[in-house]
């Protein structure tokens, strides 16, 4: 574990709530980039920004075809970077996708994508994590409520909240097929979870979150205070959200599959140290140790 002062304690004997110690926007309001000043203000207030169409239909078709190629490739399935759904035994996620696929690497470098990350974080950025997510119809399980930063801080060693994620839809996101839910404004309070981090926790948590999960009481208070926003939209839409937003998604029991590309950008001025609340680092395909800026 790290010896750096821990601004956001977690995984102790009791659940704790700490006001955010970091800015939400690290750039100045007039920082050039694709996000308008009004949208930056909205992002700072709510913790997220929805973009109705980030990429066009032809691009959606390209990325969706690449996703399908990867999840049906036996070599990819056998790779430790692929996570399999426990019940159906179908691929749920493929990590480090920007290193596996040049097509997705190009998406990461696209100025519409990385430019927004630089604008929000106020610096050059690198990819802390990338993956494709697949939620087939008829029973694909969801992700329980959590803050990504809680995990990235506790288990990967990210010191500060200077990280932003983008989820780019490759299928239609209906209000019924297990879409992303966020508690608006929850990013301004850090919820430190109770309980020590088990050894090799990542192997279990990538299929079903346990350690780092808030209590029912805390979630009820946050939901009463902030409400819950469900994100819908056409293929090609995108949602940017702060690393500390409480978010989750439900099971997909509809016939309509849902898939997306998920990219996590971290500031080059916030590189990972040793974990704050775990005995060892998670593997690099989950939490990068290559801090090379995206160019």
Curated annotation (Swiss-Prot):
It is an enzyme of class 1 (oxidoreductase). It comes from the Bacteria. Gene3D superfamilies: q2cbj1_9rhob like domain. GO terms for biological process: ectoine catabolic process. Its cofactor is Fe(2+). The keyword Iron applies. L-ectoine binds at residue 129. Keywords: Dioxygenase, Iron, Metal-binding, Oxidoreductase. It catalyses: L-ectoine + 2-oxoglutarate + O2 = 5-hydroxyectoine + succinate + CO2. Fe cation binds at residues 146, 148, 247. Pfam families: PhyH. 2-oxoglutarate binds at residue 135. Its EC number is 1.14.11.55. Binds 1 Fe(2+) ion. GO terms for molecular function: 2-oxoglutarate-dependent dioxygenase activity; iron ion binding. The record marks 152 as: Important for ectoine stabilization. Belongs to the PhyH family. EctD subfamily. Homodimer. Involved in the biosynthesis of 5-hydroxyectoine, called compatible solute, which helps organisms to survive extreme osmotic stress by acting as a highly soluble organic osmolyte. Catalyzes the 2-oxoglutarate-dependent selective hydroxylation of L-ectoine to yield (4S,5S)-5-hydroxyectoine. This is Ectoine dioxygenase.
